[in-house]
Amino acid sequence: MNIKEQIINLPKVELHCHLDGSLRPETVLDLCLKENINIPYENPEDFKSSLKISKNCSSLKEYLEKFYFPIRVMQKKENIYRVTMELLEDSKKDGIEYTEIRFAPFQHTEQDLNENDVVEAALEALQDGESKLGIHSNLILCSLRHDPVERSIDLVNLANSYNEGVCAVDLAGNESDFPPELHKEAFDLAYDNGIKITIHAGETGIAENILKSIKLLHADRIGHGIFAYKSEEILQYVIENQVPLEMCPKSNVDTKAVKNYKNHPFKKYFDLGVKVTLNTDNRTVSNVSLVDEYLNLANIFDFGIEEIKTVIRNGISASFATEEFKVNLLKKLD
């Protein structure tokens, strides 16, 4: 077997995958037509291409503009179910056995749905993914930095109302203008209720947001964390406390957080003993699969199959799955 076949066959997990950044382009087009959403392209292929990032993308802000149409079409239960199920199908093709899919429910209440309708539509797909595809999954509910803390508190209460299927809460969005502490009250509430927490931090050059997210917002994991190296103190803290980093190299190259793949700190962190995990972030926007990301580790950073297995082990142990599930998946990997 060649390296790609070996990677496909390994039982993998994904911890950082945004639903609205991972819709199939043909599905977005189909739903736009069904919902009479005006698209600014005469050629359907041009529209589908526009959902993916170009090499000329200059920033995270420009990258996030790609979410406009996916969010527009995710305003009905049947559409949310469909795109969630399709993501599970795409994940299964990648050899993923467990995935945590994240999205911001309040972004999908522009029409007739309330936030519970939104979550339940996605959960129905997760249940069918388990029974029909054999892929285990959970939801992570995202709060958005630019929203007031009261909205984040509502989000935490929403997550707390589900005993199964919702495994954690997250804080995402513009970290340059909205530091973690603005949402401390909400994440204190999550922590007090035993809800797992992951926070986007250190994605856009602000290393101190990593430590703030851990100490003020009780983060169990950090989304991205690429700029930990800017502070020796923060990097050592992450290593000594084995704080898992949900790393998404292709996405970071696309947003110009790093110059190119070789400049990404993934290998440096791996060699230093950071608990790095590998993820796609946004499959469609970044035009990447998890197998692609592991192939990049092999081809660009010379990772062998044992090093790849170590990264997968990191992901399994850092996941918010049950301990029993994690033990069984680790046995399967070994």
Swiss-Prot record:
<feature type="active site" description="Proton donor">
    <location>
        <position position="203"/>
    </location>
</feature>
<feature type="binding site">
    <location>
        <position position="20"/>
    </location>
    <ligand>
        <name>substrate</name>
    </ligand>
</feature>
<dbReference type="GO" id="GO:0009168">
    <property type="term" value="P:purine ribonucleoside monophosphate biosynthetic process"/>
</dbReference>
<dbReference type="GO" id="GO:0005829">
    <property type="term" value="C:cytosol"/>
</dbReference>
<dbReference type="InterPro" id="IPR001365">
    <property type="entry name" value="A_deaminase_dom"/>
</dbReference>
<dbReference type="GO" id="GO:0009117">
    <property type="term" value="P:nucleotide metabolic process"/>
</dbReference>
<keyword id="KW-0378">Hydrolase</keyword>
<keyword id="KW-0546">Nucleotide metabolism</keyword>
<dbReference type="InterPro" id="IPR032466">
    <property type="entry name" value="Metal_Hydrolase"/>
</dbReference>
<feature type="binding site">
    <location>
        <position position="16"/>
    </location>
    <ligand>
        <name>Zn(2+)</name>
    </ligand>
</feature>
<dbReference type="GO" id="GO:0004000">
    <property type="term" value="F:adenosine deaminase activity"/>
</dbReference>
<feature type="binding site">
    <location>
        <position position="200"/>
    </location>
    <ligand>
        <name>Zn(2+)</name>
    </ligand>
</feature>
<dbReference type="GO" id="GO:0006154">
    <property type="term" value="P:adenosine catabolic process"/>
</dbReference>
<comment type="function">
    <text>Catalyzes the hydrolytic deamination of adenosine and 2-deoxyadenosine.</text>
</comment>
<protein>
    <recommendedName>
        <fullName>Adenosine deaminase</fullName>
        <ecNumber>3.5.4.4</ecNumber>
    </recommendedName>
</protein>
<feature type="binding site">
    <location>
        <position position="18"/>
    </location>
    <ligand>
        <name>Zn(2+)</name>
    </ligand>
</feature>
<feature type="binding site">
    <location>
        <position position="18"/>
    </location>
    <ligand>
        <name>substrate</name>
    </ligand>
</feature>
<dbReference type="Pfam" id="PF00962">
    <property type="entry name" value="A_deaminase"/>
</dbReference>
<feature type="site" description="Important for catalytic activity">
    <location>
        <position position="224"/>
    </location>
</feature>
<dbReference type="InterPro" id="IPR006330">
    <property type="entry name" value="Ado/ade_deaminase"/>
</dbReference>
<feature type="binding site">
    <location>
        <position position="281"/>
    </location>
    <ligand>
        <name>Zn(2+)</name>
    </ligand>
</feature>
<dbReference type="GO" id="GO:0043103">
    <property type="term" value="P:hypoxanthine salvage"/>
</dbReference>
<dbReference type="GO" id="GO:0008270">
    <property type="term" value="F:zinc ion binding"/>
</dbReference>
<dbReference type="GO" id="GO:0046103">
    <property type="term" value="P:inosine biosynthetic process"/>
</dbReference>
<feature type="binding site">
    <location>
        <position position="173"/>
    </location>
    <ligand>
        <name>substrate</name>
    </ligand>
</feature>
<comment type="similarity">
    <text>Belongs to the metallo-dependent hydrolases superfamily. Adenosine and AMP deaminases family. Adenosine deaminase subfamily.</text>
</comment>
<dbReference type="InterPro" id="IPR028893">
    <property type="entry name" value="A_deaminase"/>
</dbReference>
<keyword id="KW-0862">Zinc</keyword>
<keyword id="KW-0479">Metal-binding</keyword>
<dbReference type="GO" id="GO:0046936">
    <property type="term" value="F:2'-deoxyadenosine deaminase activity"/>
</dbReference>
